[in-house]
């Protein structure tokens, strides 16, 4: 790995040199802790020919050590000042296979970055915490061309994504993400690893899209509706939720039995397969 020159002072100096103030609306908190950067890069386990995409590179604290591990890399940066700074520092003159896309990560067609020659995408990034969930769901729509994703988010959100069934943090995000991907909690990142420090502790996690889903919902939009509606009333029993919801049908004892689910159970006790079976059964019944 190449020498990592980022620390709190160098980040501050770079921001001043670029006349750039971290923008709250972009959720800009710049990573500078060398040991954390090293841990993140090592956890990704890159190969030279990987089709690497970084979302929100910021000042390039992760970008440069990542680029040292691969032959080519694409970054997506909405902030034009930061994109221009990256282009000057590590652009075409120093690395001809470094591409910058100046755009909102939510507007990028990631399928265009895939090719049989370059392979599936390996996506990394320190996502803006204020819009992280929409970005994750946007990326899931390209799961068939993504090998894996490594992201840094608020620790509490990562705990929800990777939660085990029955735990306090298990919920809608756990079920939806684990339906589409295998999830791994990798490491915790303290507030002091950033400049300026965020208000919360962060964590890094991995999403690996299922090549073949272990269970398949007949209607994924309806599956998502069932998951959302049930967790909106997580303290109630499933029987009560389906009886009172205006969006879901009332289920009979036979309906629950067909899913092998106890109608007295609560949402946090159901695994992904249970939710799939429940949604497949419920969608056949008029509301």
UniProtKB/Swiss-Prot annotation:
Domain of life: Bacteria
Residue sites binding S-adenosyl-L-methionine per the record: 29, 31, 56, 77, 126
EC number, UniProt record: 2.1.1.182
Main location: cytoplasm
One cellular component term from this protein's GO annotations in UniProt: cytosol
Enzyme class (EC, first level): transferase
Subcellular location: Cytoplasm
GO molecular function: 16S rRNA (adenine(1518)-N(6)/adenine(1519)-N(6))-dimethyltransferase activity; RNA binding
Catalytic activity: adenosine(1518)/adenosine(1519) in 16S rRNA + 4 S-adenosyl-L-methionine = N(6)-dimethyladenosine(1518)/N(6)-dimethyladenosine(1519) in 16S rRNA + 4 S-adenosyl-L-homocysteine + 4 H(+)
Pfam families: RrnaAD (PF00398)
Alphabetized SUPFAM superfamilies for the sequence: S-adenosyl-L-methionine-dependent methyltransferases
Keyword S-adenosyl-L-methionine: yes
UniProtKB keywords: Cytoplasm, Methyltransferase, RNA-binding, rRNA processing, S-adenosyl-L-methionine, Transferase
HAMAP family membership: 16SrRNA_methyltr_A (MF_00607)
Functional description taken from the UniProt entry: Specifically dimethylates two adjacent adenosines (A1518 and A1519) in the loop of a conserved hairpin near the 3'-end of 16S rRNA in the 30S particle. May play a critical role in biogenesis of 30S subunits.
Family statement: Belongs to the class I-like SAM-binding methyltransferase superfamily. rRNA adenine N(6)-methyltransferase family. RsmA subfamily.
PANTHER family (UniProt xref): DIMETHYLADENOSINE TRANSFERASE (PTHR11727), DIMETHYLADENOSINE TRANSFERASE-RELATED (PTHR11727:SF7)
Protein's name in the database: Ribosomal RNA small subunit methyltransferase A
């Amino acid at each position: 790995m190449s020498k990592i020159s980022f620390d709190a002072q160098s980040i501050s100096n770079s921001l001043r040199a670029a006349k750039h103030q971290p923008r709250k609306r972009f959720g800009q908190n710049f990573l500078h802790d060398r040991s954390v950067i090293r841990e993140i890069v090592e956890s990704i386990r890159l190969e030279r020919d990987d089709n690497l995409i970084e979302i929100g590179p910021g000042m390039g604290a992760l970008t440069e050590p990542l680029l040292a591990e691969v032959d080519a890399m694409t970054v997506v940066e909405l902030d034009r000042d930061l994109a221009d700074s990256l282009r000057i520092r590590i652009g075409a003159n120093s690395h001809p296979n470094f591409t910058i896309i100046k755009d909102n990560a939510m507007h990028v067609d990631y399928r265009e970055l895939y090719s049989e020659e370059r392979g599936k995408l390996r996506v990394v990034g320190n996502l803006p915490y204020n819009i992280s969930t929409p970005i994750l769901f946007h990326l899931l729509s390209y799961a068939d061309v993504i090998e894996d994703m490594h992201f840094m988010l608020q620790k509490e959100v990562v705990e929800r994504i990777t939660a085990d069934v029955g735990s306090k943090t298990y919920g809608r995000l756990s079920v939806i993400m684990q339906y589409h991907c295998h999830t791994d909690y990798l490491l915790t990142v303290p507030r002091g690893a950033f400049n300026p420090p965020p208000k919360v502790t962060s964590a890094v996690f991995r999403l690996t899209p299922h090549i073949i889903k272990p269970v398949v919902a007949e209607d994924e939009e309806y599956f998502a509706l069932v998951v959302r509606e049930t967790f909106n009333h997580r303290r109630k029993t499933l029987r009560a939720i389906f009886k009172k919801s205006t969006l879901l049908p009332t289920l009979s004892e036979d309906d629950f039995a067909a899913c092998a689910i106890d109608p007295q159970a609560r949402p946090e006790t159901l695994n992904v397969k249970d939710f799939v079976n429940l949604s497949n059964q419920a969608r056949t019944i008029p509301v």
